[in-house]
Amino acid sequence: MFVFFGWATLGTDMTSRQIWDEAYYWPFWQDIFDFWNSIPLALLGVGLGLWLRKRRPQLGTLLAVCCASIILHCLVDLPTHAEDAHRHFWPLSNYRFESPISYWDPEKGGQFFALFELALALVLSVYVFRWLRSRLTQSLLIFSNLLFLTFFLRFYVL
C-alpha cells in the first residue's frame, strides 16, 4: 500500500480522487494488495517461520511473527472492508467478502471504527511511551499521534 501510494502521489499527476477511485482498483495493484492480505499464504509463512526457527532462530521467529500479524490484520479487515474488500483466501479462492461496514467510509459507519482506532492508538501510545528511552523516539511517537489526530479531524469532523 505504501509503495502504491508513493508511486501514485510522487510518480504520477493523479488527483487524490483518481488514486482512490480508479488506480487503487486496477487489477495489477489489487493482485499485489491481495497477495499481502492472503490468509493461506500467511499461514504458510507462519509454518515456514516455525520450521526455520530450528535452523535460524531469529529469522524464523521474525517471519512467523510478521506472518501472524498479517493474519491478525486480515481478521480485522474481513468485517471492515466494503467495496474495497480483499481476496483474503487467495490463491484458494477469488471471493471477496464485502462487509456492510467500512473502516473508513462515513456512509458505512467508518467514523465509528476510525474513532475506535484513534482511541486505541492513543491509549497504547501512552503504554509504549514509557518503554521509549530517547527523546527522539518519544517525539516521533507524539508526532505520529498528532498526525493521526489531524487526519481524523480533517476527514471526519471538519
Residue ranges and their predicted role:
Residues 1-158:
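N-terminal membrane-targeting hydrophobic helices
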